[in-house]
């Protein structure tokens, strides 16, 4: 819709025009993928949404954790072919998110067949200095409890992650007695890799609040 060429053919709008020139190549909507799974007898499955798309993904959303208004602003990531800029994609995504249609208009889909995964969201912050490159995950266990974990993406970033609980203790001491609550942080380890775990705090992200201020 936004002017990127079709993935396989390199032609304009052939996917949304239902491939008028024919051929065997096809990309599918979520609804079509679900029809294929049903026809194959596939039962349990979960859908994830790589953003901006599956090629140069920075974030993965899921039905349990969908994007909010203002989050989908990093859209110019197709480096393989020329493209057209037909409209303001951030504004279009904001409208799609507000209408609850992101699962329909996501640029890419990742389907996991089988029991649901604990992982509900992941973001890769790998455009930083190597000592600060991390992955943030939101997980939900079988009881529905959510937690947030931050993993180092490089050996150099391990010190940054290990420092997070210390920063938490200093912030807690600094703001003791005030109305500001500091998110609890614990250090853990998985397969020899440290991670910082935080409680999941529901609320509205800063990006959404700032977008509202800009609108005013």
Features from the language model and the residues they span:
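Short, glycine-/aromatic-enriched active-site segment of Class I SAM-dependent methyltransferases
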Residues: 3-24
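Short hydrophobic/aromatic beta-strand or adjacent loop that forms the aromatic wall/cage
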Residues: 105-112, 131-136, 193-195
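Alpha/beta-hydrolase-fold catalytic nucleophile elbow
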Residues: 2-3, 50
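Conserved Class I S-adenosyl-L-methionine
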Residues: 77-112, 116
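Conserved structural core of kinase catalytic domains
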Residues: 182-216
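ATP-binding glycine-rich loop module of kinase domains
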Residues: 122-173
């Amino acid at each position: 819709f936004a002017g990127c060429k079709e993935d396989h053919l390199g032609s304009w709008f052939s996917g949304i025009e239902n491939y008028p020139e024919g051929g065997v190549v096809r990309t599918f909507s979520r609804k079509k993928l679900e029809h294929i799974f049903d026809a194959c007898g596939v039962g349990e499955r979960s859908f994830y949404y790589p953003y901006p798309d599956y090629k140069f993904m920075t974030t993965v959303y899921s039905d349990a954790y969908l994007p909010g208004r203002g989050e989908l602003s990093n859209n110019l990531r197709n480096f393989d072919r020329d493209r057209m800029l037909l409209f303001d994609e951030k504004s279009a995504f904001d409208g799609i998110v507000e209408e609850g249609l992101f699962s329909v208009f996501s640029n890419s889909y990742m389907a996991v067949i089988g029991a649901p995964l604990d992982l509900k969201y992941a973001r890769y912050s790998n455009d930083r200095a190597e000592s600060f490159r991390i992955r943030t995950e939101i997980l939900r266990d079988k009881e529905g409890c959510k937690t947030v974990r931050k993993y180092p993406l490089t050996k150099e970033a391990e010190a940054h992650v290990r420092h997070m609980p210390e920063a938490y203790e200093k912030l807690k001491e600094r703001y003791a007695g005030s109305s500001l609550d500091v998110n609890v942080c614990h250090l853990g380890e998985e397969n020899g890799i440290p991670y910082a775990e935080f409680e999941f705090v529901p609320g509205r992200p800063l990006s959404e609040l700032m977008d509202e201020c800009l609108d005013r």
